[in-house]
UniProtKB/Swiss-Prot annotation:
InterPro entries in the cross-refs: Spider_toxin_CSTX_knottin, Spider_toxin_CSTX_Knottin_CS
Organism whose genome encodes this protein: Lycosa singoriensis
Keywords assigned: Disulfide bond, Knottin, Secreted, Signal, Toxin
Disulfide bond residue pairs: C48-C63, C55-C72, C62-C87, C74-C85
Signal peptide region: 1-20
Compartment annotation: Secreted
A GO MF label: toxin activity
Family: Belongs to the neurotoxin 19 (CSTX) family. 01 subfamily.
GO cellular component labels: extracellular region
Protein name: U3-lycotoxin-Ls1a
Domain commentary: The presence of a 'disulfide through disulfide knot' structurally defines this protein as a knottin.
Tissue expression notes: Expressed by the venom gland.
Pfam families: Toxin_35 (PF10530)
Residues that make up the propeptide removed upon maturation: 21-44
Length: 115
């Protein structure tokens, strides 16, 4: 019985050691992969696609407006078989930006009155 217990403890120790080694290898691989993804992201982030330009090459490359990032919207033009993708600002975000701009202007007027 002591032999079985000793053998079990030894087996458990070896198993946990090998698992730790495998996890270290996986962590190192994840770190390397993460670093390469970050480098690609930095390289891609240098140039953005302006509004109403083609974004089919990279659908996450649209530029930011004052508050929000534009969205790559794809559609099929009438009578066309090819998909067209352009960077556009959704209407609800457009209205939110207009409201924020008006609020800023109104805040400036209040500051002048009570300033």
């Amino acid at each position: 019985m002591k032999f079985v217990l000793l053998f079990g403890v030894l087996l458990l120790t070896l198993f946990s050691y090998s698992s730790a080694e495998m996890l270290d290898d996986f962590d190192q691989a994840d770190e390397d992969e993460l670093l390469s993804l970050i480098e690609k992201e930095e390289a891609r982030a240098k140039e953005c696609t302006p509004r109403f330009y083609d974004c089919s090459h990279d659908r996450h490359s649209c530029c930011r407006s004052e508050l929000f990032k534009d969205v790559c919207t794809c559609f099929y033009p009438e009578g066309g078989d090819n998909e067209v993708c352009t960077c556009q600002q959704p209407k609800h975000l457009k209205y939110m930006e207009k409201a924020a701009d008006k609020a800023k202007k109104f805040g400036g007027k209040i500051k002048k009155w009570f300033g």
